[in-house]
Amino acid sequence: FGNMFDLAGSAPYKKIACLKEKYGPILWLKIGSSMNTMVIQTANSASELFRNHDVSFSDRPIVDVNLAHNYYKGSMALAPYGNYWRFSRRICTVEMFVHKRINETTNIRQESVDKMLRLDEEKASSSGGGGEGIEVTRYMFLASFNMVGNMIFSKDLVTDPESKQGSEFFNAMIGIMEWAGVPNISDIFPCLKMFDVQGLRKKMERDMGKGKEITKKFIEERIEERKKGEKNRSIKDLLDVLIDFEGSGKDEPDKLSEDEITVIILEMFLAGTETTSSSVEWALTELLRHPQAMAKVKLEILQVIGPNKKFEECDIDSLPYMQAVLKEQLRLHPPLPLLIPRKAIQDTKFMGYDIPKGTQVLVNAWAIGRDPEYWDNPFEFKPERFLESKVDVKGQNYELIPFGAGRRMCVGLPLGHRMMHFTFGSLLHEFDWELPHNVSPKSINMEESMGITARKKQPLKVIPKKA
C-alpha cells in the first residue's frame, strides 16, 4: 500500500497507528528489498505475543550502526536469545537491579539529585530569573548520567570539573544515542551499506570508538588502583564485579574480556540515562499544560513531606497521585514507542498468520496506550484514571507496556522506576515551575524527536522558583 517513505519522519509510530483502522491489529509490512516486518497494535495481540509466543520472537535484528566496533557482539540488548544473553542479564540484574542493590546505592542517587537541584538554582539565578527559562532536561540528564556512573565507577563523570575523560565520555554517549535512533536507508536497502549514504556508520564509528576508548581507560585505571591497593570500597561497584567475575560452568565464560566489560558498561549508560530524563521532561510538560494536576501533585507532596524536609526515595510509596502522573505520562509518551524490535527465530503461526523466520516484530506501545478499547478519553492527560486501577507498567498489563514485556522486557526497570520517581518528586518538591513569559500552557510544542527515545523535539524551557 502507498509509499513506504510516508512512514518516515520523526514519529513513524503515529502513522503506523493510523493504519490499524483499515488493516486491523496486526500489520504486515515489506520494507525495502528484504525486511519483513510485523507490527502489533493492540493489547490483545501483544498479550498473545508475550504470553504464548515469547520465545519464538525473542531474537533481535541487528541494524547497520550496531556493527560499529562490533558493539552488537557483547550487547545484552541485542544478543541472540541464548546463553550469553541469559548470563549478561543475570549478572546485571544481581549487581545493579535487585532491590537490595538498589537500596544500597540510595546515597548515590541522593547526591546526584542534590547536585542537579543546585545547578538548576544556580542557572536560574545567573539568568537573573529572566523570562526565557532554562532547559532543565540538561540537568536531569546529567543527574541520571552521574547516578549510573557512580554505580559503575564510584565517581561523578561530568560534574567533576577535573574530569576531562568524563566530559568526553558524556559527549560520546550523546552521539551514540542520537545515531542509534535515526532511520537508516542502509537497513532498508542492504546494497547501499557500502556507501553509508547518510554518514551514520561513520558517525557511530567515531562516537562508539571514543566511548569504548575512554571506558577501557577507566578499566585500566581501576586495575592499576587494585594492584596498588588503592581506594578499597566497602561495597563493590559494577566495574569491580565485572573484573572479578569467574564463570561457574559451561554456559558462562571463565572471565570477561576487556571488550565484553566495555560493552556491558556502555549499555548501562545507554539504557539508564536518557529514558529517565526524557520521561521526567514529558511529565513536567504535561503538568505545566494542566495546572490543576500540577496543583494537586504539589499539594500531595507538601502534605506528605512538608516544606522543610528533603524529598527521599522512601517517600515515593506515600505519593499515589505522583505515581499516577508518571504512569499517565508513560501511557501517552512511552520512551520507546515501538519498543526494541524483536525477530522471529523460527517460522511461526501467529494468530492465524504464517510468520517467516527472520521477520522483524515491532510492538506499537504508543498506539496501545491510546487505544479507546482500553482507555476512556485516551488522548486526555488524566492521572486520576490510575488512582483506583491496578494497571502497572511492569509488563503484566498489556494495555500499558512502555518498558516491554516477556523475557526481553527492560532489565533495568526497577532502578529506572526509582530514578524517575525520585528525580521527578525532588524537582516538584524543591521548586515551583513556571513557563517563560511568552509561552502559554496550550502553546507548548509537543512534537517528538526520535533518538534512542522519543524525547521532546523542542526542549522544555521553564523557570524554577524556590518553593
Curated annotation (Swiss-Prot):
Pfam families (alphabetical): p450
Q: Which UniProt keywords apply?
A: Heme, Iron, Metal-binding, Monooxygenase, Oxidoreductase
List S-S links within the chain. Answer: none
Chain positions recorded as heme binding sites: 410
Which cofactor(s) does the record list?
Answer: heme
Q: Which GO terms describe its molecular function?
A: heme binding; iron ion binding; monooxygenase activity; oxidoreductase activity, acting on paired donors, with incorporation or reduction of molecular oxygen
Q: Which PROSITE patterns does the record associate with it?
A: CYTOCHROME_P450
Q: Which domain of life is it from?
A: Eukaryota
EC number(s) from the headed UniProt entry: 1.14.-.-
Q: EC top class, in one word?
A: oxidoreductase
Q: Which family does it belong to?
A: Belongs to the cytochrome P450 family.
Tell me what this protein is called: Cytochrome P450 76A1
Q: Which organism is it from?
A: Solanum melongena
| Gene symbol of the encoding locus | CYP76A1
